[in-house]
C-alpha cells in the first residue's frame, strides 16, 4: 500500500502525517506537491493540516483548485482511502468530497488544546481498531473548526452513521451536533478537525491517534490488494 501526503503552500502538518505513517507505522509514503497532476500508483491520500494558501478567502477555499485535486477526487470516487485533518478537512468540504462547511469558532479565537472525543462509528476504514463509543483524547488547533450544515444534511449524516467522531464533555468550537469528524456515504473519505497524527507516540504523552493510521493500513492494504 502506497500513501501520498499532499503538500500545499502553507501546509504545516505534512511532516507530522508523514512521520506518523513512515516512522511510527512503517508505511510506504511520499510527499506529493500540490502542483502535480497524477496520483498514479498511490492507494491512499492524506490532506494535512496547516494554512493552505494562507487561508485567504476561506480556509481550504483556494486549495480546492490545486492541480492535484482532480486526482484526489478520482481516488475517492474509486473507493480508495482519502483522509483530511484540520485544514485537510476544510479542503475536503470545499472540494465537495464531504458535505457541510467549517466556519470560525464561536469564540472567534484560535483554540489549541487536547480535547475528549467519542468514537461514534468504528465501522470505517480509519476507525476499525477503536471500540464504538470509546472515549479518546486528541489535540486540536484551529480557528475555523465549527462544523455547519443545514438540518437536512445533519439528519442525513446521523441517519447514515457518517458522524465518525464527536466532541465529548465540551464543544470547543460550536460545531453543530458536536461533530468533530465525518465520512462520506461510502466511508472511504474521512475529515476531522482533531489531529491524530500528533498523538501517536508515548514520548509525546498520548497514543490515542495511532489507531487511525493502523486501521487505515490494515484496511487500505486489503483494498489495494483486492
Curated annotation (Swiss-Prot):
GO CC annotations on file: cytoplasm
Signal sequence extent: none
ATP-binding recorded as keyword: yes
One GO BP annotation of this record: 'de novo' IMP biosynthetic process
Key words of the record: ATP-binding, Cytoplasm, Glutamine amidotransferase, Hydrolase, Ligase, Nucleotide-binding, Purine biosynthesis
Chief location of this protein within or outside the cell: cytoplasm
Organism superkingdom: Bacteria
Pathway: Purine metabolism; IMP biosynthesis via de novo pathway; 5-amino-1-(5-phospho-D-ribosyl)imidazole from N(2)-formyl-N(1)-(5-phospho-D-ribosyl)glycinamide: step 1/2
Active site: 86 (nucleophile), 195, 197
UniProt-listed PROSITE patterns: GATASE_TYPE_1
Residue intervals of the Glutamine amidotransferase type-1 domain: 2-226
Localization per record: Cytoplasm
InterPro entries in alphabetical order: Class_I_gatase-like, PRibForGlyAmidine_synth_PurQ
Catalysed reaction, written as an equation: N(2)-formyl-N(1)-(5-phospho-beta-D-ribosyl)glycinamide + L-glutamine + ATP + H2O = 2-formamido-N(1)-(5-O-phospho-beta-D-ribosyl)acetamidine + L-glutamate + ADP + phosphate + H(+); L-glutamine + H2O = L-glutamate + NH4(+)
Pfam families xrefs: GATase_5
UniProt-listed Enzyme Commission number(s): 6.3.5.3, 3.5.1.2
Gene Ontology molecular-function annotations: ATP binding; glutaminase activity; phosphoribosylformylglycinamidine synthase activity
Function: Part of the phosphoribosylformylglycinamidine synthase complex involved in the purines biosynthetic pathway. Catalyzes the ATP-dependent conversion of formylglycinamide ribonucleotide (FGAR) and glutamine to yield formylglycinamidine ribonucleotide (FGAM) and glutamate. The FGAM synthase complex is composed of three subunits. PurQ produces an ammonia molecule by converting glutamine to glutamate. PurL transfers the ammonia molecule to FGAR to form FGAM in an ATP-dependent manner.
SUBUNIT field: Part of the FGAM synthase complex composed of 1 PurL, 1 PurQ and 2 PurS subunits.
Cross-referenced NCBIfam families: FGAM_synth_I, PRK03619.1
Name of the featured protein: Phosphoribosylformylglycinamidine synthase subunit PurQ
Protein's gene: purQ
Amino acid at each position: 500500500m502506497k500513501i501520498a501526503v499532499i503538500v500545499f503552500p502553507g501546509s504545516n502538518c505534512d511532516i507530522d502525517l508523514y512521520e506518523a505513517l513512515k516512522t511510527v507505522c512503517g508505511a510506504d509514503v511520499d510527499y506529493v506537491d500540490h502542483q502535480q497532476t497524477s496520483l498514479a500508483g498511490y492507494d491512499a491520500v492524506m490532506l494535512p493540516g496547516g494554512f493552505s494558501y494562507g487561508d485567504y478567502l476561506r480556509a481550504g477555499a483556494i486549495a480546492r483548485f490545486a492541480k492535484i485535486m482532480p486526482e484526489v477526487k478520482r481516488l475517492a470516487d474509486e473507493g480508495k482511502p482519502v483522509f483530511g485533518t484540520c485544514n485537510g478537512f476544510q479542503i475536503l468540504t470545499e472540494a465537495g468530497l464531504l458535505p457541510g462547511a467549517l466556519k470560525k469558532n464561536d469564540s472567534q479565537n484560535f483554540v489549541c488544546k487536547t480535547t475528549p472525543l467519542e468514537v461514534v462509528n468504528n465501522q470505517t476504514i480509519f476507525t476499525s481498531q477503536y471500540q464504538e463509543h470509546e472515549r479518546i483524547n486528541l489535540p486540536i488547533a484551529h480557528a475555523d473548526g465549527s462544523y455547519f450544515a443545514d438540518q437536512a444534511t445533519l439528519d442525513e449524516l446521523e441517519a447514515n452513521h457518517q458522524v465518525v467522531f464527536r466532541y465529548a464533555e465540551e464543544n470547543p468550537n460550536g460545531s453543530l451536533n458536536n461533530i468533530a469528524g465525518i465520512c462520506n456515504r461510502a466511508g472511504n473519505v474521512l475529515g476531522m478537525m482533531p489531529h491524530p497524527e500528533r498523538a501517536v507516540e508515548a514520548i509525546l504523552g498520548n497514543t490515542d491517534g495511532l489507531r487511525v493510521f493502523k486501521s487505515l493500513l490494515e484496511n487500505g492494504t486489503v483494498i489495494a490488494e483486492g
